[in-house]
């Protein structure tokens, strides 16, 4: 029997949510799971990933790669997500790539198309912001990521998405890029 590694795993823990996704390369099958991260979320991450894989009958040796959110976002959240992805990648001998959390937020919020701003609180009246347009399964970055005063966004066109979880499918789809996971703390 020949083992086919056809699944890509996406992980994001940079925001108040823990987002997981599985994407099948050939069949375009997608599964998502998002839950509040909360206290102790980092300790639950690896068991959550194992349960997520099991719930969808995907064995670890069927993973072809892992994509992980690199922020901007929570320092502890970023560290736990990236460390878990790197540990799993090393154990399974699969590539691990990083992609932006703001991009993953825009990808999910703009699922039906259109354009808008993904925002994360940068504190002190500032926001991490990215303006994007969704075209099919692609995301076209119009501006950003930038960190700006919130007041600067008041005159910008487009809907703002701030309290939405990142769509980890974005990270899964980018799992086979050659971008190493370098955190963007903000």
Residue positions per predicted region:
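Generic short alpha-helical segment signal, independent of protein family or function
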Residues: 50, 71, 93, 110-111
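Oxyanion-binding and handling regions
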Residues: 1-30, 36-44, 58, 97-186
């Amino acid at each position: 029997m020949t083992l086919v590694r056809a699944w890509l795993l996406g992980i994001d823990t940079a925001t108040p949510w823990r987002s997981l996704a599985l994407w099948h390369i050939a069949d375009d099958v997608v599964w998502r799971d998002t839950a509040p991260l909360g206290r102790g979320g980092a300790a639950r991450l690896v068991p959550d990933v194992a349960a997520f894989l099991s719930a969808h009958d995907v064995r670890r040796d069927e993973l072809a790669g892992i994509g992980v959110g690199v922020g901007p976002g929570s320092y502890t959240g970023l560290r736990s997500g990236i460390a878990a992805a790197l540990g799993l990648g090393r154990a399974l001998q699969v590539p691990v790539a990083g992609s932006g959390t703001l991009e993953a937020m825009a990808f999910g919020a703009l699922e039906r198309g259109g354009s808008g701003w993904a925002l994360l609180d940068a504190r002190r009246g500032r926001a991490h912001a990215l303006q994007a347009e969704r075209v099919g399964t692609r995301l076209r970055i119009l501006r950003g990521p930038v960190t700006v005063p919130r007041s600067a966004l008041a005159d910008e066109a487009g809907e703002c998405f701030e309290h939405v979880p990142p769509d980890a499918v974005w990270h899964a789809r980018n799992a086979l890029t050659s971008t190493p996971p370098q955190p963007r703390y903000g």
